[in-house]
Amino acid sequence: MSDTFVPLSRREFGLSLGGCLLGSRLFGADSSLPWMGPATVKKVFLAVPQPTWPRPDLDVAREKAELEVTLSELERKHAGSVVLTGGDLVHTPEQAEAFAKSIGDADGLLIIDLTSGTGPLLRPFRDLATPTLLFARPYSGWSYVDVTTWAQNGKKADLVSTSEAGDLDPYMRIFRTIHHLRRCKVLVINSGTGPNRTAEAFTRQFGTAFGFPGYQDLKAVYESMDAGQARTAAGEFARGALKVVEPSMDDITASLRLYQSTLGPTD
């Protein structure tokens, strides 16, 4: 069967997009779709066994405990966007190597240096593909030199040197975006030409999955969706409005049914 393109008006296109947004709520997708969940970020603290800087009598355990409180507050502030896991205190390159191997499929890595001399502890993290953020308080050490070099050499890494926890807020949103891009799936409706170099480059950079169904493929899936379920969802949507001026109930139902259909072809 040859693909047939059916043109949409600007209003029809907008309604279709609106149906997708509404569908994520009306069909309970917020909690079930992998791209809608929070980012998982593993945190690790670095400190040499015998500190000399920022001072030789530094209580490393106390410093870590205070920062754990700060990071817990940060996580609560961004509940639903980021989950901070891990929290190991690494003293040796061997411990750092073991922690690096435990990162697995985490969306990001948060490194906190507590002392100077942590260069050897950083090396196991240098070649990881996991996006990395260094949280370095002023004068805590010189890890920022290593991480800056990583970024200059193309690693997905950044650093923030600050004593203000609020300066980490933008990075929590970035981690959430990284998670979303890694887990989401994009449908490009075309004439069956398949992947292109732009999509392949985007996948390499962000991990996003692309599907390239033809119009007839999408139409077939659309028609297989439960029209009654879409009609029920449309009624729920309409009841939540003060007044539905436009679109018609048929249009709302069709938009929500289209949303349902987009969940199938990329699985």
Predicted features along the sequence, with ranges:
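Metallocofactor- and cofactor-centric catalytic cores in central/energy metabolism, strongly enriched
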Residues: 31-119, 123-144, 175, 204, ...
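Short, glycine-/small-residue-rich phosphate/pyrophosphate-handling segment
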Residues: 139-178, 182
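N-terminal export signals
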Residues: 2-30
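Flexible, glycine/proline-enriched loop segments at strand-loop-helix junctions
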Residues: 56-57, 157-162, 184-193, 245-250
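Short, aromatic/basic amphipathic alpha-helical patches
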Residues: 144-152, 197-206
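Fold-independent oxyanion-binding glycine-rich loops
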Residues: 17, 113, 138, 189-191
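Short acidic/polar capping segments at secondary-structure boundaries
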Residues: 139-140, 163-167, 191-195, 215-219
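Conserved anion/nucleotide-ligand pocket segment
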Residues: 176-205
